Amino acid sequence: MFKAGALWLLILGAVHSTSLFIKQVPANDTERQILDLMTSYRFNLSGSLRSMSDLMRGFSVAFMLAPLAFGVLDLVLSRERAGLLKRVALVQIIWLAAMIVVALRYFFAVPLSFLVVALLIFVLAWLKLPADASN
């Protein structure tokens, strides 16, 4: 199950990366105005001029990199002893639960569903993995 969780995180990151290549097309004049302002109006953030579009792109890239990095880390660790994997699965559970709280407030159904599936896989992995006998 642990390796399945790692693979699911890689899928999550890969699917999210596709959003970085899709250009938003406004459906009406209001959306056109919003998108124009999001890309053209710049905020002075401690001397750096950034648009709302820049900020959203940065957060989107970070959201893509986190599951990719955690998925790779999990694959690298997947052959380690069960006790370590159980602790890493718990860390994944905590991180994913926090992400789900954020997703419930700010995201929509697709990213939320991917996060929930990842959480369920790691909960099952945690339940299935035996505790480390050396502790």
Predicted regions and their residues:
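Individual transmembrane alpha-helix segments
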Residues: 51-65
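Juxtamembrane membrane-water interface segments that cap and precede transmembrane helices
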Residues: 39-55
